Regions:
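Mobile, glycine/GP-rich and aromatic-enriched active-site lid/loop segments adjacent to catalytic centers
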Residues: 98-142
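Secondary-structure capping and boundary motifs in well-ordered enzyme cores
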Residues: 111, 144, 164-168, 189-193
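Active-site-proximal substrate-binding core of FAD-dependent oxidoreductases
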Residues: 1-2, 133-142, 202-213
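FAD cofactor-binding and catalytic pocket of flavoenzymes
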Residues: 1-98, 106, 146, 168, ...
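Hydrophobic, well-ordered secondary-structure elements that form the walls
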Residues: 85, 119, 152, 177, ...
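Active-site Gly/Thr loop motif
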Residues: 129-167
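Internal hydrophobic alpha-helix adjacent to the cofactor/substrate pocket in enzyme cavities
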Residues: 82, 119-129, 196-213
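A conserved FAD-binding loop/helix module that cradles the flavin
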Residues: 183-202
Length: 213
């Protein structure tokens, strides 16, 4: 089962709030799923009371197949989700430390409920048995591709970067990672970061030639 015909990773694109019957009243935006199948450990299938040749025979058998779906949803941009500098608590160089004050809200909590319900329904209709939902503890930072803290915008008072990813008050500094985003979508943003970086680099070259940097 380590080679040949076997299941692989799967991706379910967003299907909520894209029009018509897909629209929901209890949350905005949407989510997608990433998932796949795998076999459990052979040792988990062997009873602890086994020993000797019987035990050796059991642990050579592959474990049961399992399929999972993990939901990835958009987090709306909330004004009170923010990063600030703590000037009362400095690091060893005397610089202010960073303080994060952010959490998911009612919109995301309602979305998580729907994620679980829909995943269970999909798997059961596909013929899987012993389907269980799981809603683990979540905190910002566990989604790998976190976004925000240096958002793009036109207003200097409400954003850090301009449309070219330049820091408003320090034009020779560009920020092109997830910090520039205003909200976290439900898809992998890596290609978007690459595009923003290429655009910012092109802009920087042009500005440098004009002696503006």
């Amino acid at each position: 089962y380590y080679f040949g015909r076997r299941n692989n990773g799967i991706y379910v694109p967003r299907f909520r709030n894209i029009g018509g019957k897909t629209n929901r009243k209890d949350f905005l935006r949407g989510y997608g799923y990433q998932g796949g199948g795998s076999r459990g450990s052979s040792t988990s299938e062997a009873a602890e009371i086994l020993y000797g040749s019987q035990f050796k025979e059991e642990i050579l058998k592959p474990g049961r197949w399992k399929v999972r779906l993990s939901g990835f949803g958009e987090i709306l941009p909330y004004q009170d989700n923010r990063m600030t500098l703590d000037f009362n608590k400095t690091d060893k160089w005397g610089l202010p430390t960073v303080t994060f004050n952010a959490s998911i809200k009612e919109n995301e909590l309602n979305m998580r409920k729907d994620m679980q319900q829909q995943a269970i329904e999909m798997l059961e209709k596909a013929g899987f048995t012993d389907v269980k939902g799981h809603d683990g503890d979540y905190a910002l930072g566990l989604g790998i591709h976190e976004m925000g803290t240096a958002r793009m915008g036109h207003n200097v008072k409400t954003s850090v970067l301009n449309r070219n990813n330049q820091v408003h008050e320090v034009p020779n500094v560009y920020v092109t990672d997830g910090s520039a985003m205003t909200s976290a979508g439900n898809v992998n943003p890596s290609l978007t970061y690459m595009a923003l970086t290429a655009r910012a680099a092109d802009h920087a070259v042009k500005e440098l030639k004009k002696m503006n940097l």
